[in-house]
């Protein structure tokens, strides 16, 4: 990628970040939580979406899709690579909250995949990651178990943390653990809540 294009993409990202809304979400009114994760093999993406009840986390739906990848891997621009597979996996589903395996506001420019998906769909999203990016601003995340939690869109950090704590099993939110297994090639989820990640 040329430096000129890199700078333009950074500027687009910063402008999109200004459109992110952080506000409290009434967690007691949440009925469904979705989760999405994407894995790669060669130049194909395998995206998994699961829908669970909240707060008891009963698996309601699962969907796995495989698509060609049209954008290269570029650190901090993951949203350009993963948005299409994620949206195809979601289809018409619109959970009350969506957990995204990727960053939200916990991003050097305050706009990761979770923020982009939330902005595109107009639904509350939470970014979940196992590690932080270099240059991530302090105060943009909270660690819950093994997960770095950040605002995606239409939720604030305390509400996001409450949702993730409710779903936390063995250090990571159960819906994302299920989506992770499906995206990596498992045909279905047969584990209980204590199944290892």
Curated annotation (Swiss-Prot):
Mg(2+) binds at residues 37, 101. GO terms for molecular function: deoxyribonuclease V activity; magnesium ion binding; RNA endonuclease activity, producing 5'-phosphomonoesters; single-stranded RNA binding. The record marks 73 as: Interaction with target DNA. Pfam families: Endonuclease_5 (PF04493). Its EC number is 3.1.21.7. It is found in: Cytoplasm. InterPro entries: Endonuclease-V (IPR007581). Keywords: Cytoplasm, DNA damage, DNA repair, Endonuclease, Hydrolase, Magnesium, Metal-binding, Nuclease. One of its GO terms (cellular component) is cytoplasm. It comes from the Archaea. One of its GO terms (biological process) is DNA repair. Its cofactor is Mg(2+). Gene3D superfamilies: archaeoglobus fulgidus dsm 4304 superfamily. It catalyses: Endonucleolytic cleavage at apurinic or apyrimidinic sites to products with a 5'-phosphate. Belongs to the endonuclease V family. HAMAP family: Endonuclease_5. DNA repair enzyme involved in the repair of deaminated bases. Selectively cleaves double-stranded DNA at the second phosphodiester bond 3' to a deoxyinosine leaving behind the intact lesion on the nicked DNA. This is Endonuclease V. It comes from Thermococcus kodakarensis (strain ATCC BAA-918 / JCM 12380 / KOD1).
